[in-house]
Swiss-Prot record:
Cysteine pairs bridged by disulfides in the record: 200-237
Organism of origin: Pongo abelii
Coiled coil, from the record: none
Protein name: VIP36-like protein
Keywords: Disulfide bond, Endoplasmic reticulum, Glycoprotein, Golgi apparatus, Lectin, Membrane, Metal-binding, Signal, Transmembrane, Transmembrane helix
Cited InterPro entries: ConA-like_dom_sf, Intracellular_Lectin-GPT, Lectin_leg
GO cellular component: COPII-coated ER to Golgi transport vesicle; endoplasmic reticulum membrane; endoplasmic reticulum-Golgi intermediate compartment; Golgi membrane
Length: 348
């Protein structure tokens, strides 16, 4: 069923369609002037959106992955091209990632991902897909679509190859989501089914029009929708209430190929801050959390590692330990002398 995402409304659809057809700077300037470069109301309930450029990426990708001033880092086989950033080429055993260097402290947000997956492989002879991340750790290569296993945060997976044999319940490519507190492993053999929050079929390979994915996190409500039919309409995919994500994590995207391969391209990542009205009761309920979790879904507990001691703290510990040690020796000597003196008196 076609739908408009939450309070996105017609403004974002109109703007995105124009940007997709013409990526020129002049058009972007006209759009900004037309909107007054200010916040846009995107629906009822006094919800406004603000584009956060420090967490966004679009053409011409100037400075991406180069120098300490870049907001985005490349990893592995990822390459900056003129029209896209290629995470992995259509070659075997490749791995690449793109990570934002700035931690995100937004309370409510929306990430729009413009991507393309294509290659020479025929049916079920391509892989493996890509992932979009909001995690505590960044730039950590691993087996989960090019990222580390047992991650802490949110992972959204566009899985293009079914690993599980006798798979009849779902059609691939398939989008799924997972929240992890660092205790869970992604089950490749079962395509992540034991730990997924939900999912949907998404036919996204070798399409001749733009494909989009949106991840929306508002009032601890996670919504994932897609625009993959060339109709500029959002379709429901995943909706999960009670998702608790800490602030200060990093956005990124990654991909991996094995014996099978595909081109995995990212055209743009656009993060919007959403300002949402909350009642006093909601303010109390929506306090910051320190580990990701999902209501009504028990995750194995993990013991948070103790933070490393600073130099000053270590000095204080050593100093006071020495003071206590010397004090104990002095007290021991005094008690020993008194004991010897009493022993001599008894002897005489």
């Amino acid at each position: 069923m076609a739908a408009t995402l939450g309070p996105l409304g017609s403004w974002q659809q109109w703007r995105r369609c124009l940007l997709a057809r013409d990526g020129s700077r002049m058009l972007l300037l006209l759009l900004l002037l037309g909107s007054g470069q200010g916040p846009q109301q995107v629906g009822a309930g006094q919800t406004f959106e603000y584009l956060k450029r420090e967490h966004s990426l679009s053409k011409p990708y100037q400075g991406v992955g180069t120098g300490s001033s870049s907001l985005w880092n490349l990893m592995g086989n990822a390459m900056v091209m003129t029209q896209y950033i290629r995470l992995t080429p259509d070659m075997q055993s490749k791995q690449g990632a793109l990570w934002n260097r700035v931690p995100c402290f937004l309370r409510d947000w929306e990430l729009q991902v413009h991507f393309k997956i294509h290659g020479q492989g025929k049916k079920n002879l391509h892989g493996d897909g890509l992932a979009i991340w909001y995690t505590k750790d960044r730039m950590q290569p691993g087996p989960v679509f090019g990222n580390m296993d047992k991650f802490v945060g949110l992972g959204v997976f566009v899985d293009t190859y079914p690993n599980e044999e006798k798979q009849q319940e779902r059609v691939f490519p398939y989008i799924s989501a997972m929240v992890n507190n660092g205790s869970l492993s992604y089950d490749h053999e079962r395509d992540g089914r034991p730990t997924e929050l939900g999912g949907c079929t998404a036919i996204v390979r070798n399409l001749h029009y733009d494909t989009f994915l949106v991840i929306r996190y508002v009032k601890r409500h996670l919504t994932i929708m897609m625009d993959i039919d060339g109709k500029h309409e959002w379709r429901d995919c995943i909706e999960v209430p009670g998702v608790r994500l800490p602030r200060g994590y990093y956005f990124g995207t990654s991909s991996i190929t094995g014996d099978l391969s595909d081109n995995h391209d990212v055209i743009s990542l656009k993060l919007f801050e959403l300002t949402v009205e909350r009642t006093p009761e909601e303010e109390k309920l929506h306090r910051d959390v320190f580990l990701p979790s999902v209501d009504n879904m028990k995750l194995p507990e993990v013991t948070a590692p103790l933070p490393p001691l600073s130099g000053l703290a270590l000095f204080h510990i050593v100093f006071f330990s020495l003071v206590i040690f010397v004090f104990a020796i002095v007290i021991g000597i005094i008690l020993y002398n008194k004991w010897q003196e009493q022993s001599r008196k008894r002897f005489y």
